[in-house]
Amino acid sequence: MTTTISTEKQSIKQIFLWEILWILVPFGIYFLSHIVHPDWYKHFVYQSWGFLQGRLDLLNLPEYYVDLIYWKDKIYLPNPPLPSILLMPFVAIWGIATEQIRVCMLFGAVDVFLVWILLGRMTVQGVMRFGLTILYGFGTVHYSASIIGTIWFYAHVVAEWGMLLALVEFFGKRRFVLVGFFMGLAFLSRQATILGSLFFLGWLLWERPEKWIQKGFSFGAGFTPLFLFQSWFNWARFGDPMESGYMLQNYYSSVQAPAIHKYGLFNFAYIPKHIKLIFTEMPEFLPQFPFIRPKPEGMNIWLTTPAFFALFAANWFDVLVILAGLSAFLISLPAMIYTATGWVQFGYRYALDYLPFLFVAIASGLQRMPQALAWTLIALSVIVNVWGVYWVVKLGW
């Protein structure tokens, strides 16, 4: 009995130490990466302030803010409410002065910790578990998103939080009511992420068909309350439970406006420019030192994160890898037909909507390839993203 209690205390102590390592250290690095920052485009702070005042609209926004909805003499956001809800304790203390970017850094660090837990539950051990965690936190666009922290990037980081919680639960006790709830959290930040439910429900259908209805119902029981909350949020503002505001959006940046007037917000005509950005867009080459810098439009995923090449080495005969790839593909589709490609950004920020799922396949590939090559790809990815963050800060993105 004494031995059991001692072992449990030791286990709790180890977990606490890893929490310190994988939350405080990444947060510290994110903080130091962007100490002096422009305190702008923090729409969610204003939304959170409105919630605390019992309002659903936004007041006293700076004039330069974009991506807004003007509806019946009020200003609204088309974005789901979870990022604003999570800010409420901070806004209750500091009001509009709350630095959204710091909260984004905190959730970015929590995401890194969840990746560490996830990899352990995926039976990735030893130095590769460490390397993959570093890769996620500092070798992907998660790094730059976490230290930019404006409305668009903060929403991505919170959505990652929900998806990673769902994956951690799935690779753990597989309580599908919690998996559904966590995916609901992701949905309340970035709605396209709900398409990642294929990963969990597809696994049920493939591996546990006799429990598909039971577990699928449990998933729905966890997800439905959050879906209903989003529906109420829509109805309370626009009188339509299915209208989030995107189709009512009427204030765009000057860059987006011409295409929107021709094609609308969503159109298949936008797919080619997304494909170009994702797979072939190069950085900007300069005639003088430093000779190269990232473009504000973005940069292809292979240069941004060379470890993505590990996808070609992944075990695509593994049902989980297949489902991870399919889920990532499905989640990517709504963004592919959207007018904006994510500008201004380092890399391709919409990849964050499916990075947690894609990372399952990346982890598979990095473990299967020669370790020297795997570590080279991880190191290159970190170097590129440190370079990217340098320019993000220098250029004021």
Residue ranges and their predicted role:
Residues 1-397:
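Membrane-proximal envelope and lipid/glycan-remodeling enzymes
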